[in-house]
Swiss-Prot record:
Pfam families: ETR1_N, GAF, HATPase_c, HisKA, Response_reg. PROSITE patterns: HIS_KIN, RESPONSE_REGULATORY. This is Ethylene receptor 1. The modification 4-aspartylphosphate is found at residue 659. Leaves, roots, stems, seedlings, flowers, anthers, carpels and ovules. It comes from the Eukaryota. Changing residue 104 to A: No effect on ethylene binding. Ethylene receptor related to bacterial two-component regulators. Acts as a redundant negative regulator of ethylene signaling. In the presence of ethylene, the auto-kinase activity of ETR1 is inhibited and the non-phosphorylated kinase domain binds tightly to the corresponding domain of EIN2.
């Protein structure tokens, strides 16, 4: 009998039960072996896993458990001791690994629980971030709507368009049932329904501004929910409505524009507001959200700014229209003034010509009478007539000069002259009158005063004569002193600053008298044309009141200044003026040529047999001019028209006197035709002299452009015509008196 080293099963075998256990252990073993493989796979795929050793222990535990189940398959039947030993070893290892894993889990489980806590924290954080993102999206959406509404509002500067656009865009953006704007009335005591969303022309009814709901809204800058039944919220019929929509109201500031007065705008002596009311659709559960209220508040502020801009634009356009109307009126006034000035100048020109013609006869005949044998009484009368005529001629020249000064047509005629000689000539002219009144006159010229200067000699002499003449006229006793010096800085004329250079200097002339003096309050009137103060003179003193007015304008034209100083009535006065003069750079020889009318050679004085042609449309003037020439020994032929002059003139005539004040320009063109007539015999062409009553510079320039040889200003005396003939026959071109 063979011996078997086997172990019998512990209980009798049941074939069916054994099969189920066998199959179960097999699948348990397969599961235990597959779980570690899956864990190893996922751990390798995971980039971060903090419990790798625990996983190794857990895997070993599972593998050993699977091994015990697999070995247990051989224990259901008779098996050898080796199988039992293997089974025991596997269970011991499984027990060790299981205990180690259990001990390790004591430390791992709290960490695993904290992971869950972190997960919950992260979920809460994520939910909070989602809420914040929703708020940001809401704010962004609100901002987008605000920008869109602002763009629509700012796209125009018309007040009515702004308000209507605001209501339309708010109604579209917020899906409103109604939106309205209440504007304060002019008195500010009521609110008037001015604009609504659904009605183009709302019924204009008002509510008192002292309503509690209005005070509540005006008391805060936030949008306020109000009752749908409040007076300002009754915008649409409520019949048939189950539930009215929620209503909010917000104030719209009307910005104070201190520099503008806007029509149809409330008086803004105190802070004023308009009221904007917004209603959600009725019969709906919709409510106002915070971001919608914020949108309404921002839009209200934007509307306030846009309204202020529109108001400024309206006032600017109104001011522009007013300015355009004023400009049109000013332009019309300017044209009328220019027309009046032209009419005045034309009138003065005509009157000048018409008055100079009889004066020409008076002065000419008086000068002829002076050449005859007269008794002392007759000579005195003739001299009186001549002086009165010359005074009248001077007055006419003053009026014409003033007219040209005022319209800016008068210009200075600059030239080099002897300044010292000019002062001496002025004294020579004034001394006869001063001697009669027993008034001594002294002339003081500063040592550094230049002798030869560049300026308008005639106008400077006229200024000095006017001022010195006034000193003589209004002084009954005492003395008169004339001082000339180079101007230095003077603080008394605060608005006039002297800036001399190497090419010019400022001449100061002081005329001091011991006459009647001037009341200080009358000094500002002195330089007013046609003005004579009672303290200064009476009408018996003579004069037109133009002398100082013209002198002031001449001084201004010479870039100077003039003023008068007086301590009061009976204390005399001092007239002071500064004028700008150029410093002459000419040589001594050329300077000597600037000395006025000092003949260097004997002048012609015998004109016997000189054939002269006189053309003048005025019979009296023609006769007087002929008489002067005949008295000088000339053989005179007279004509009354241009055609007759052109037909009569011949090479026998040495001089032709022609009146250029005749109507039209033919009187100038006749000079050109005379030049053409003598083209082949230029040396036989007669000298052409213009007789003119116009003292302006344009007459002289026109005469030069038409080829005339000289100009003689009416009225003409015997000495004038003698000097002209002498100068022409030397020969040299003369433009006398211009």
């Amino acid at each position: 009998m063979e011996v078997c080293n086997c172990i019998e099963p512990q209980w009798p075998a049941d074939e069916l039960l054994m099969k189920y256990q066998y199959i179960s252990d097999f699948f348990i073993a397969i599961a235990y072996f597959s779980i570690p493989l899956e864990l190893i796979y996922f751990v390798k795929k995971s980039a971060v896993f903090p419990y790798r050793w625990v996983l190794v222990q857990f895997g070993a535990f599972i593998v050993l458990c699977g091994a015990t189940h697999l070995i247990n398959l051989w224990t259901f039947t008779t098996h050898s001791r080796t199988v039992a030993l293997v089974m025991t070893t596997a269970k011991v290892l499984t027990a060790v690994v299981s205990c180690a894993t259990a001990l390790m889990l004591v430390h791992i489980i709290p960490d695993l629980l904290s992971v869950k806590t972190r997960e919950l924290f992260l979920k809460n954080k994520a939910a909070e971030l989602d809420r914040e993102m929703g708020l940001i999206r809401t704010q962004e959406e609100t901002g987008r709507h605000v920008r869109m509404l602002t763009h629509e509002i700012r796209s125009t500067l018309d007040r009515h368009t702004i308000l209507k656009t605001t209501l339309v865009e708010l109604g579209r953006t917020l899906a409103l049932e109604e939106c309205a704007l209440w504007m304060p009335t002019r008195t500010g005591l009521e609110l008037q329904l001015s604009y609504t969303l659904r009605h183009q022309h709302p019924v204009e009814y008002t509510v008192p501004i002292q309503l509690p709901v209005i005070n509540q809204v005006f008391g805060t800058s936030r949008a306020v929910k109000i009752s749908p039944n409040s007076p300002v919220a009754r915008l649409r019929p409520v019949s048939g409505k189950y539930m009215l929509g929620e209503v909010v109201a917000v104030r719209v500031p009307l910005l104070h524009l201190s520099n503008f007065q806007i029509n149809d705008w409330p008086e803004l002596s105190t802070k004023r507001y308009a009221l904007m009311v917004l209603m959600l659709p009725s019969d709906s559960a919709r409510q106002w959200h915070v971001h919608e209220l914020e949108l309404v508040e921002v839009v209200a502020d934007q509307v306030a700014v846009a309204l202020s801009h529109a108001a400024i634009l309206e006032e600017s356009m109104r001011a522009r229209d007013l300015l355009m109307e004023q400009n049109v009126a000013l332009d019309l006034a300017r044209r009328e003034a220019e027309t009046a000035i032209r009419a005045r100048n034309d009138f003065l020109a005509v009157m000048n010509h018409e008055m100079r013609t009889p004066m020409h006869a008076i002065i000419a005949l008086s000068s002829l009478l002076q050449e005859t044998e007269l008794t002392p009484e007759q000579r005195l009368m003739v001299e009186t007539i001549l002086k009165s005529s010359n005074l009248l001629a001077t007055l006419m020249n003053d009026v014409l000069d003033l007219s040209r000064l005022e319209d800016g047509s008068l210009q200075l005629e600059l030239g080099t002259f002897n300044l010292h000689t000019l002062f001496r000539e002025v004294l020579n002219l004034i001394k006869p009158i001063a001697v009669v009144k027993k008034l001594p006159i002294t002339l003081n010229l500063a040592p550094d005063l230049p002798e030869f200067v560049v300026g308008d000699e005639k106008r400077l002499m006229q200024i000095i004569l006017n001022i010195v003449g006034n000193a003589v006229k209004f002084s009954k006793q005492g003395s008169i002193s004339v001082t000339a010096l180079v101007t230095k800085s003077d603080t008394r004329a605060a608005d006039f600053f002297v800036v001399p250079t190497g090419s010019h200097f400022y001449l100061r002339v002081k005329v001091k008298d011991s006459g009647a003096g001037i009341n200080p309050q009358d000094i500002p009137k002195i330089f007013t044309k046609f003005a004579q103060t009672q303290s200064l003179a009476t009408r018996s003193s003579g004069g037109s009141g133009l002398g100082l007015a013209i002198s002031k304008r001449f001084v201004n034209l010479m870039e100077g200044n003039i003023w008068i100083e007086s301590d009061g009535l009976g204390k005399g006065c001092t007239a002071i003026f500064d004028v700008k003069l150029g410093i002459s750079e000419r040589s001594n020889e050329s300077k000597q040529s600037g000395i006025p009318k000092v003949p260097a050679i004997p002048r012609h004085s015998n004109f016997t047999g000189l054939k002269v042609l006189v053309m003048d449309e005025n019979g009296v003037s023609r006769m007087v001019t002929k008489g002067l020439l005949v008295h000088l020994g000339c053989e005179v032929t007279t004509v009354s028209s241009n055609e007759e002059c052109l037909r009569v003139v011949s090479h026998e005539h040495k001089v032709v006197f022609m009146d250029v004040c005749m109507p039209g320009v033919e009187n100038y063109q006749i000079a050109l035709r005379i030049h053409e007539k003598f083209t082949k015999q230029r040396h036989q062409r007669p000298l052409l002299v213009a007789l003119s009553g116009n003292t302006d510079k344009s007459t002289k320039e026109k005469c030069m452009s038409f080829g005339l040889d000289g100009v003689l200003l009416k009225p003409v005396s015997l000495d004038n015509i003698r000097d002209v003939l002498s100068d022409l026959l030397e020969p040299r071109v003369l433009y006398e008196g211009m």
